[in-house]
């Protein structure tokens, strides 16, 4: 595989550029549902900090940066960067966090042999119980869509004005439920999503709110049914993940001189 060019996150203040082990594009672009006229670019990546930042008193878990303003929503020229330490990411992935699991299946913009040891073994991070966080996040998005949770997203008020509801929340509901079903049935998450045309149509307001609720309920039911017969283990092997993490850190530090 072409290792590709390492993204320059140092320009955003990232202090461990040489410790980066993978990077990918996330968000709507990864799902295949990006609207070029409105969406920013979301960068995700993983790095292994120096030993003192893992074993010492001053531990770190992530680096975040955005070129967007705090008072206004991001535009198509803005960039969001979210980089996790390998340790933090593994903990999230082992719990079935949808965004963390995407790292295992997303097309890579940059990768290393260190990350290869994880990407070739996605199954150790997958379990039947992971349907719960996917559907939980979908339910959260539905509640926000219906105004039952959180505050109104003022940066996307034009979506409500135009379509009667926040179509981006709706897209995430359908996406997450579909990912949960595929994960239970096949032990993978296809990125970009096979139904990306449908997701774009949802974002453009081609579906009524009633249709979104009906489709979401149907996909949730199918995901739960798939969980019952899923070939995935009941839970992840945390000992195996811990051994893989320890080996990756020791090898990386040895090769880089700590």
Q: Which residue ranges define each predicted feature?
A:
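Structured mid-to-C-terminal alpha-helical surface segments
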Residues: 131, 135-138, 142, 148, ...
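Metal/cofactor-centered catalytic core regions of large enzymes
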Residues: 60, 69, 73, 240
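Helical scaffold of the NTase/Pol beta-like nucleotidyltransferase catalytic core
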Residues: 1-28
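Conserved NTP/Mg2+-binding pocket subregion across the NTase superfamily
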Residues: 67-180, 191, 201
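Short, solvent-exposed loop/turn segments at secondary-structure junctions
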Residues: 28-31, 49-52, 181-182, 189-190
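A generic fold-level signal
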Residues: 17-18, 36-38, 168
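Generic structural signal for hydrophobic core residues of well-folded globular domains
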Residues: 47, 93, 177-180, 184, ...
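Catalytic metal-binding acidic patch
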Residues: 31-64, 173
């Amino acid at each position: 595989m072409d290792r590709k060019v390492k993204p320059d996150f140092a320009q955003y203040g990232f202090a461990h550029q040489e410790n980066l082990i993978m990077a990918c594009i996330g968000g709507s672009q990864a799902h295949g549902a990006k609207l070029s006229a409105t969406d920013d670019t979301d960068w995700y990546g993983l790095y292994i900090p120096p030993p003192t930042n893992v074993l010492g008193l001053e531990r770190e878990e992530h680096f975040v940066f955005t070129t967007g303003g705090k008072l206004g929503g991001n535009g198509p020229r803005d960039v969001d960067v979210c980089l996790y330490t390998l340790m933090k990411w593994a903990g999230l992935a082992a719990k079935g966090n949808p965004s963390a699991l995407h790292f295992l299946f997303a097309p890579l913009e940059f990768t290393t042999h260190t990350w290869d040891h994880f990407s070739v073994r996605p199954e150790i991070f997958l379990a039947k119980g992971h349907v719960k966080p996917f559907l939980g996040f979908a339910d959260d998005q539905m509640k926000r869509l219906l105004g039952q949770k959180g505050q109104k997203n003022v940066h996307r008020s034009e979506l409500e004005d135009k379509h009667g509801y926040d179509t981006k929340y709706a897209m995430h509901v359908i996406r997450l439920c579909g990912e949960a079903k595929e994960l239970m049935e096949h032990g993978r998450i296809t990125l970009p999503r096979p139904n990306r045309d449908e997701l774009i149509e949802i974002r453009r307001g081609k579906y009524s709110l009633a249709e979104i609720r009906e489709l979401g309920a149907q996909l949730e039911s199918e995901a739960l049914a798939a969980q019952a017969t899923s070939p995935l283990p009941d839970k992840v092997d945390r000992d195996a993940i811990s051994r893989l993490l320890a080996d990756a850190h020791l090898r990386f530090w040895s090769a880089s001189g700590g």
